[in-house]
Amino acid sequence: MTDLRLFTSESVTEGHPDKICDQISDSILDALLTQDPTSRAAVETLVTTGLVHVAGEVTTSGYVDIPQIVRDRIRDIGYDSSEVGFDGSNCGVTVSIGAQSPDIAQGVDRSYESRSGSASTDAHDLQGAGDQGLMFGYASRDTPVFMPLPIYLAHRLAERLAAVRHSGELAYLRPDGKTQVTIGYEGLVPRTVDTVVLSTQHGPQVSQEDLRREVEEHVIRPVLAAAAEIGIELDSRDATLLINPTGKFEIGGPKGDAGLTGRKIIVDTYGGFSRHGGGAFSGKDPSKVDRSAAYAMRWVAKNAVAAGLADRLEVQVAYAIGKAAPVGLYVETFGTAHVPEERIVRAIRETFDLRPAAIVERLDLLRPIYAQTAAYGHFGRELPDFTWEALDRVADLQSAAGL
């Protein structure tokens, strides 16, 4: 296998500065939705040495204690003392929250179709998209959960790194960390693990030699073994393992780098295997199609691949602000389609209602479910609340496509 093509994806742990911000923003959103499921929110967070700043726009009938939510989330991640470089109990928290612009609200609350007299009697025609934009969804047969293999493994490594820290198995680890996986592909088939890069914050008491040996033993090898157990066959015998390749990594988290909500959009999605419309997810309620339509596109793509319409499928949807119906739908199958692509597009249109209100209703998105999406990927984790991962439209798509 000398002609393998190498594809790489990365992930980060929950203690990475940008991911701290995503989790804070989504924790605030969850609290708002708990108080008022119709809350509109766009919450942005910045963290830096000793300070958290929360800003954005919120319209709600509820009340939430934002500083307390911030502190609780930071401590849960593991930043609970000055020794690790950040302390949720003592850091500064500033809040600058305003109301959603009425100019935006008017288009969401009363759609273009409603205002122009072209709306049907269907209530889903009455809510417009919260912004213009384009969103992508993707699925492939690389893994049992229909995710590309490089990002799947990168997430599992990051999750495992956090797990052995929280459990005390590797007690010297600290919250910040990054993972990266390079997979060798023969055509469209993943064959080898070429390189694993793992950088983890740690305390001063451990040598780099011990850290590298124990991270390989307790993190990398168990993740590769677990992948094999679910049928992912990879040759990792010649894999290059680069663990803390710069040496010591004691200063991390917000003390090492400032963090911002929405700066890990490729980590959040498909690891670069699919295109991205540019809109981040965290801190946004589901009236924002940046989030809800991206979730719907994952639902569409996963069901389409599971239905046998293609082995790899990317789907794009586009919206105009204030308009209920999408303005565009596009499918790319990278030469793997089992039926003509135009038939796939027709089947998707027949099977899925992609108006924003219909997406929110079908995927039950007005729930406080978002903090759990904010680390280790919004897609490919088949958790009970992740309705967009359900394979519940397979038969409908097969019927609509004539299979």
Curated annotation (Swiss-Prot):
Domain of life of the organism encoding this protein: Bacteria
GO MF entries: ATP binding; magnesium ion binding; methionine adenosyltransferase activity
Chief site of localization: cytoplasm
Record keywords, A-Z: ATP-binding, Cytoplasm, Magnesium, Metal-binding, Nucleotide-binding, One-carbon metabolism, Potassium, Transferase
Record localization: Cytoplasm
Record's keyword annotation contains Phosphoprotein: no
Record's protein name: S-adenosylmethionine synthase
Upper classification of the organism: Bacteria, Bacillati, Actinomycetota, Actinomycetes, Micrococcales
